[in-house]
């Protein structure tokens, strides 16, 4: 390696010279251009002899500024008693060899002093025996002897693993470099000559200057048993395990102290201040006090664990025992955090003044914002700390398995918290921004959102899938979609909770994360959830809202709406024997026996004849009734023995019970209507109700025809649906038209203004010419 290459490598490794973006073909010219203004030289002498140059020009613009910088460097070199060059030798480049000799002498003179400085033993040019592996300076090797000594030294340390400790901070300037902080332990993966080594820190591999670190001797090395194999490392493992555990305790104490300081110094005084209302302060605070108290409890528990002998430590077990509290505290905090950020945004000026009056540094709002976000950062830190502890823990340690379980639990909790925060932020956005095509009262009047998620839905038998955002309130389910430009949300409809029937489809149809919503007031909807967690949450919340005294057992998994109606009433009655009729407690009306709408108008034909035949034949055999009832879906396959029993007395008893239920309802209906007749109950037959409909065809011809009530209702339903769609399209077209008109108006005004200015300028120019 020639002197120019060695000097380039030396200056880059010291951090006083920036790495070139491309490979240097001529190191001498590179040095001339880099050192000409004297800034690099002043940085160098300050690095070698701190305080040698108090002030120098960082951005010299003139020759005098450059010469002054060079003179400052030469003054510092005088204390090293080396032969110096003239300032003009460097600035003009005429006698650059003297500059090189001076720099080489400075390096040699400071070699012994740098053993205690960031450059270390490798900072000298004699140690930089090869090219820099950072792809900026490519130089050949000239000292294989020292390289072989380093490799031999690594072999003696065990498993060819060289471990170093950072003595000073180093910030990466390229993507392939590694940023290190003072005290970091780096596992060297590649030793190259030239002052740059490759190593791994916290799972990231990159290049770092070798003279910024020092090698850890085997006697002082706190290594993990998993990092070295082939020799006894129990004392080293114990040493580093203790260090990591103490780090966990120290950071936990500091975290608890920061939370307590924020609560006492800022949040509690803010409560007595008039900047925020009671509701806003509650949103800002959330469950911060509970989190603060819990962290102090956790800190005490970990301290108690550390007092036992090392082989009896139960850090993982302690965290697992407290994991339910962790989950409840942090999930609640994450759910409230978007609302707290909204309060911070709305009252940023007032809160900033308050924080600064309380002693916070400017800007005060930043202190409050970052402090309220610390629980999230700490939650992520738990995973890293526990992984580090597990790395330096023996596999036979009694707490090893609990540590692994705790790592998984914290990773899961961290993911849940992130998802919950995103969901709540989206929910807050929906509630705070106007919704396009919204119908009815404001969405805020519906109360709090119980659950919200993005789903994919299908209408009826339609195979087309649509993305929707479902918002569940206590009384209604709101359906929204993203606007075409993804700038907001559009209203797509709502489903009342009353009368809603929810069925799981994962069990019935074998589809994962799917359920259906049906009811008398809504068309069948199939909902596909994104994951099983959302699916379980939807089923739990919908079951809770729809399953009750007024829902009439709407969650029963039967395919027949009429059967589900009858059986649901029986579930609300008093306990009775197998053949006793139910005792009707709630008021009953004839409308309760109205049949569900058929899938097609012709499905109800012959209903009266079938009913009369059923009631006539039921007196002869109970089995006759069973033939005309909807077949029930079996939950599981019955064995042969169960099948035989089913065909015997159980079948007769069940059929008789169904018949008694129907007869009881008919009797109750007759009683409520004030009649005591034993005849067949009056049933509304939509197909027999005829209406005279006058229609006008497209050709202008008027036709009068007779239609059944069912046909008329379905025709009206289709017309209403078409009208709604047309109305929605007209609203969208109107909005687009208004927007286009506004844009056109702005454009016209702009053109008129430009035209007016042109006319004025032309008239003024003509006037000046005439004058």
From Swiss-Prot:
Residues 442-547 form the PH domain. Detected in adult heart, spleen, lung, skeletal muscle, kidney and testis. Detected throughout embryogenesis. It comes from the Eukaryota. The modification Phosphothreonine is found at residue 133. Residues 115-157, 556-580 are annotated as: Disordered. SUPFAM superfamilies: Calponin-homology domain, CH-domain, DBL homology domain (DH-domain), PH domain-like, SH3-domain. One of its GO terms (biological process) is intracellular signal transduction. GO terms for cellular component: cell-cell junction; lamellipodium. The modification Phosphoserine is found at residues 126, 224, 487, 639, 679. Acts as a RAC1 guanine nucleotide exchange factor (GEF). This is Rho guanine nucleotide exchange factor 6. The gene is Arhgef6.
